[in-house]
Amino acid sequence: MPTRAELRDHLVRTRIAGDVATSRENNLDHYRSLANRDPYHLFGLTLSDGWSYRDVLALMAKSAGVVADPEHRSGQDTIDPDRTIDAIEAMGERIGQVLAGGRARLMFATGHPTGLLAIHLPLARLAVQHGATLLTPAEGWSYVGHGFGRRRRIRYFGGVAMLDDRGGFVHTHDADPMRAMIAELDGVRPDLVVADHGWAGAAGEAGLPTVGFADSNDPALFVGEAEGKIAVTVPLDDNVLPRYYDPLTAYLVSRVTRAL
């Protein structure tokens, strides 16, 4: 397990945090889209009034560490690695507390299988090792989602829900798959949902205890956290090489076990 200082250096070196690959232009475009209540950027959340573009930018500067100056409109943007680590510690404590209660029920889901699956899978295994049940509702449920015109379905790997498109796991912001999972829970409420993108947003909107990961250009979960619908949101680049997440995952696992 890395120390906090070692993890901080690693996050900056691999651009999980620090000077990230997501451009300032892309970040600001997504903040405007969220302020305009674009469904694609809401991740299944409904927001209270008052979240203007400037409000979203100010929140992202506070929660993720992007540049606060609204006049900085192009070029490099940032994620504060210390905010990332603080959120990892908070997430680890929350997961550990749930597992410590015994016989916990958890759901895992990711809309970024090429990146964040590398974090979800070890967490799911850890949960099982500590007596948790991984809920896997709506496996095989399918729908024609937004913008791609063909049917996709929920498939689980290692207890983690993802979208399958003709044999491949795919990126998605959609909230509909998590809504389908919740509809099939049949009264069995998970003690915690660990997710990202629309999977996390829909869970939080439904009132399920939820922790999640989000990139600097995905402000919805941070707004959801500010409104009390998401318990913890970890800011990070969500699509670096999967092996780059290993030290972060080891640090997170250590925080979970410390809280048990």
PLM features: residue spans?
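Long, charge-dense
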Residues: 119-177
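Generic hydrophobic alpha-helical segments
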Residues: 91-95, 178-182, 248
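Short, acidic/small-residue loops that bind anionic groups at enzyme active sites
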Residues: 129-142, 206-223
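Electropositive, gly/pro-rich neighborhoods at or near active sites that engage anionic ligands
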Residues: 1-105, 110, 114-122, 255
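C-terminal functional extensions of proteins
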Residues: 188, 211-260
